């Protein structure tokens, strides 16, 4: 059976423009040879191709997850957006249970979260859809508790969102019960005096009041208070039904956990913090949009389970596998490559090469690439599949130092040349790809350093000159390797091989 080495270069995309492109500027004769003499193709590594929102830059975690899974893995916001796009909110049993609880108890459903199109902690479209589904399910009493953003979006930008929300609640006979800036409702620094102010408004115990949400916004703006710092206030036109009390149900529609946990703790009196809530309520149901670590509640959208990633396929087929990376990227070739699970397969070996302990990798752009190559050359003959990661383009690219990134790529060029020559001599086939872009964009149009990832496509190159490769995305790589090795792919791997037969 053929043996394969899969090389994942971290943070190296492809683009034709030379300006600020360390990959085009570096002296890389072996890469030049790979692209001119070996089969190669383009692989998409960002946005919807890897289960992220459209246009979003790729990252190492998502990249390795998709490579190992053999299918597009939807995570976080994109997981919920896909459910929204596919009109699946109405089938979400966790939402339906919350709706049913308030109908049975003749109580109120409280929807709370960041009213924002920002997509960092929440997305207002999710709230609007939950309102629609609550109405369609016959929920009579719904109170919305609005948190102002002004941080992931412009400081004074909530008016349009608030107008949309007001129109919807009027249509369904629901109410905007409270308003507070995220400074209060979404503190994450254990400043519970802030969180308490938002909590008291939700309980109907705030001294600040408004009769119209939009008028209250104007009043706050007139005092130079922006969305983030809107003072917690309650709607004075509402009766006690619309403020949080026993037997009510809560849906917290923030999907990101870090700034949702303190307020959740106050409502649930959880064991996550030592702080004791000023008022205790016993809600019938508490739903978080995604998992809030340390908060016990019902979760509307769980992260996707990746069954049968490439490592499991090799294990089940009684094949051997080797994983090699330096400390900085070790979790990526193990935990993320294995579907977000920490598992050591019985026919496997893992080698972690120590990353250099330095303040900045700009000072040591070679990183541990030579040692990684040496370890692979020492061990790969004994394994059916070797997966390794070279961290240089990403970690040095993040420093924003162009000269160091050029050195990093030249070091990598030499190490790849060493590895491929050895593999060819030992009749082992190499596939080379990358998890996302970075080093190919080091300067912006104003010649300022760029340190972030990119949405550039990446390479897939193979040392087997008899092959032809089709273009694809990261999720096609595992099926391609299995196809090449004559192994069946599991049903979960719904992406195709890129071998052009």
Curated annotation (Swiss-Prot):
Enzyme Commission numbers on file: 5.4.2.12
GO terms for MF: manganese ion binding; phosphoglycerate mutase activity
Pathway stated in the Swiss-Prot or TrEMBL entry: Carbohydrate degradation; glycolysis; pyruvate from D-glyceraldehyde 3-phosphate: step 3/5
Gene3D superfamilies: Alkaline Phosphatase, subunit A, BPG-independent phosphoglycerate mutase, domain B
Free-text remark on how the cofactor is bound: Binds 2 manganese ions per subunit.
Binding site for Mn(2+) 1: 394, 398, 453
Protein known as: 2,3-bisphosphoglycerate-independent phosphoglycerate mutase
């Amino acid at each position: 059976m053929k043996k394969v080495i899969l090389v994942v270069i971290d943070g190296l995309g492809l683009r034709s423009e030379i300006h600020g492109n360390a990959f085009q500027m570096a002296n890389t004769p072996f890469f030049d040879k790979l692209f001119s003499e070996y089969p190669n193709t383009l692989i998409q590594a960002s946005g919807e191709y890897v289960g992220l929102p459209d246009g979003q830059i790729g990252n190492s975690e998502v990249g390795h997850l998709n490579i190992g899974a053999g299918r597009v893995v939807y995570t976080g916001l994109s997981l919920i957006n896909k459910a929204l796009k596919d009109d699946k909110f109405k089938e979400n049993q966790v939402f339906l249970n919350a709706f049913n609880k308030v109908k049975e108890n003749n109580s109120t459903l409280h929807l709370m979260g960041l009213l924002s199109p920002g997509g960092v902690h929440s997305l207002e479209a999710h709230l609007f859809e939950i309102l629609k589904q609550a109405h369609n399910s016959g929920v009579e009493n719904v109170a919305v508790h609005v948190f102002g953003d002004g941080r992931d979006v412009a400081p004074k930008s909530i008016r349009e969102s608030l107008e949309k929300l007001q129109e919807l609640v009027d249509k369904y006979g629901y109410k905007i019960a409270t308003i507070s800036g995220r400074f209060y409702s979404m503190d994450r620094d254990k400043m519970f005096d802030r969180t308490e102010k938002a909590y008291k408004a939700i309980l109907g115990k705030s001294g600040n009041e408004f009769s119209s949400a939009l008028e209250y916004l104007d009043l706050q703006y007139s005092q130079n208070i922006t969305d983030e710092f809107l003072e917690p206030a309650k709607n004075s036109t509402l009766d006690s039904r619309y403020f949080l009390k026993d037997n009510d149900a809560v849906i917290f529609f923030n999907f990101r956990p870090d700034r949702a946990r303190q307020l959740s703790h106050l409502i649930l009196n959880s064991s996550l913090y030592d702080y004791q809530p000023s008022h205790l309520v016993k809600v019938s149901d508490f739903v978080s949009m995604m998992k809030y670590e340390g908060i016990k509640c019902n979760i509307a959208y769980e992260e996707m389970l990746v069954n049968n990633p490439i490592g499991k396929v090799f294990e089940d087929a009684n094949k051997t596998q080797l994983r090699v990376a330096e400390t900085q990227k070790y979790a990526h070739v193990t935990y993320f490559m294995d579907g977000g699970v920490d598992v050591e397969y019985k026919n496997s070996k893992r080698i972690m090469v120590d990353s250099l302990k330095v303040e900045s990798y700009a000072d040591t752009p070679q990183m541990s690439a030579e040692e990684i190559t040496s370890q692979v050359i020492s061990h790969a003959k004994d394994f059916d599949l070797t997966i390794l990661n070279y961290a240089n383009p990403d970690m040095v690219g993040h420093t924003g130092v162009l000269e160091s990134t050029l050195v990093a790529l030249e070091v990598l060029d030499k190490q790849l040349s060493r590895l491929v020559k050895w593999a060819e001599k030992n009749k082992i086939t190499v596939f080379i790809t990358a998890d996302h872009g970075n080093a190919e964009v080091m300067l912006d149009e104003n010649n300022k350093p760029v340190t972030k990832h990119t949405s550039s496509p990446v390479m897939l190159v193979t040392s087997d000159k008899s092959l032809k490769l089709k273009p694809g995305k990261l999720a096609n790589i595992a099926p391609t390797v299995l196809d090449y090795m004559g192994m069946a792919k599991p049903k979960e791997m719904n992406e195709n091989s890129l071998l052009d037969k």
